Structure formats: C-alpha cells, structure tokens
C-alpha cells in the first residue's frame, strides 16, 4: 500500500503495515492528519519490536499517538534504568546533575563526551565511577606531550610460534576497552590526538594493514583543560566533531563542597556498584532510536543547524557576524538522537522542539569555529547559540 496516498479512512478499517512502512508514519503524518470520521484509526505493527502504534482521530480531525502497553513498559524500564544508573553515580559524584544527564544521554546514543574544566573538579572520577556502575572494562590514558600513537593503539611485537618460528603478534593497547578515559587530551601532540579518530568513528583500529574491531559498547570520555592554560594543544576540528557533546564542568556550589568534604575526609569512602550491563546500554540505545519525530520538528532541528552557517540564507545575525564555520551534519544527527532520549526521560513518546533546544548547547558548542571578530570581542560559542535559539522561528523551514 502507499501510505502517502491516504487522506481518510473508513470506519473501523485497520491497516497492517510492514516495519519500513511503520517507520515512515512520523514523516508522512507529523502528528496532524485530517481524517473524515471520529472512529477512524491507523494501526502499524512494528515487526522488529512487536510494538503496536495507533493513530486515533478526535472530533476536530487531529490525531494523537497511543503507544501500546508493551512499548510503555519498555520506556518505563528505560527511565528507571537511567535513573538507577544516575543515582548510583551520584553516590560518588556530588552535584553536577546536568553533566551526568548529558553524559548518560551520550553513552546511550553511542556517542563520546568531551569534558572541559580546570583540574580538581571530578572529571576523572566521573568516568571511573561510570565504568564501575556499568561493570565494563575501563582503561585510563594520561595524555602527555611525549605520548605516541602506539602507546594508545598498541603495536606489533615479535613472538615465538609453537614450531619455534618468529612471528609478529599484535599487542593491544589501552584503547581496547569499553570505557576509555583520555585524561587531559589536549596535552598530547596533534599526531597522538588524531590516533583516536578512527576508533571513535569506526569503532575499529588498523595496524599493519589489519583491522581490529573494538568491543561494544565503546565509549570515549576525554577531559581537557581550558586552552588558555600552559602546555595545551587545541584539538583539531575533525576530532572535535567526533564528540557527541562538549560539557563545561563548573565549580561546585557551597552546599556541594560540604558534601564533598563529608564523603572524602571520613573513613567510609563511597563506591558505585554495578547496576547495569553493557548489553543493557545497547538495548536502551536501540529503543531510543524508535521514538518518532514529526516532520515539522525535524525541520526545526535542521533550521537550528543551518542557522550556524554564516553563508546560509537562514543564518542567525550572530552567526553571520561571529562564526567562521558552522555545525556539520554529524551535529544534526547528534541533536536528533539526544532529543529522542530527552523525550523518553520527560515521559513522552515523541520529540518536541524543547528537546532539541535542551540539546543545542552541548551538541553544537564545539562544532562552531568563531572568526577573528568573535574571538577579539570575547564572544563564546554559547553566546551565539543562545542568540540563535531566540532568533530561529519554529516554522523557519516549514514545508
């Protein structure tokens, strides 16, 4: 059947859709369909997830999405698991709730996180605690100016085979883990920083012409010091774009400092226990991708991204004045994936514009390069994004 040819449905008629047709529903019917009768309904059966979706018309002719009990249970479990993981990490990490939310969203979405802040704010401890709470293999690499790519990936060593022959054998580096902490990544040279590129994007590394697949989930959490500190190298644009979000770690509140002292200066030291597995994280990732997004909301996300492009007709005033290069398509992908998870956490079964707005700062701030005028005036990427969110109209790309 051709769904996009349907404008109204006969009473009590049921359409049984394939999975590909089911996925097309949010694009064809962006939650507003003009139907003829009050009792009309469209039923789509998602074969892969065994999930039934119903679109029912109201007397005004608009449709609302009813998610069946099975999917509701899955999404309720998603929220409970997310909160359980966050609560376990919070036993060790004091405050920084927004940082924890965006970090876990990135993990579930299959992305990587870049944390920026001065030393001593708990960036390294956050990554260690996350690995403990997930019972995943964890490795830490302290980036220094003399660190070489082989120290990260691994190298070929000469070994003796069973028959006495000498053969080359690949000795894996610390990159082969589920959770990798790249500590103070901007203290290493660009050559070593670039060694992470293939691993972060392809989840594999190539050594001596042989490709080695990394185990899933693979999550890189890098920390960096502000660039104005001595001995730092700015990350190349290609590597910055590989990070799902960039999070700015701020100083804790006074009340949080008191709690930190209570937890760290007494005999009992809190420690996170494993509450989820890597397999569970992968399941949550697959479930989050099933959340539909209406066509007009998707177009609003596109409008936000192109508004960062100074040469685009929809560019915001601040982008035209202060931005040299805007966000890439990878930034749009991260914006949508993050918004889907935000929708689940907000107990909704579709993406709203507010979900996109809430992800705009962490997703876009490191994907924009300011021009000389912006740098000279002390303008930050966050300033440009906030102005852009105020300027971009919700129907900027209306069909």
Please tell me what each predicted stretch does:
Residues 107-144:
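Walker A/P-loop
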Residues 159-163, 188-192, 200-290, 340-342:
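Canonical AAA+ ATPase core
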Residues 76-113, 118:
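Pre-Walker A (pre-P-loop) alpha-helix and adjacent loop at the N terminus of AAA/AAA+ ATPase modules
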Residues 183-184:
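Walker B catalytic acidic pair
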Residues 161-180:
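Conserved alpha-helical scaffold flanking the Walker A/P-loop in AAA+ ATPase domains
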Residues 137-149, 209-213:
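Short beta-strand-centered segment that lines the nucleotide-binding/catalytic pocket of NTP-utilizing
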Residues 75-78, 92, 232, 246-318, ...:
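Conserved C-terminal "switch" segment of AAA+ ATPases
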Residues 67-69, 313-399:
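C-terminal engagement/docking regions of AAA+ P-loop ATPases
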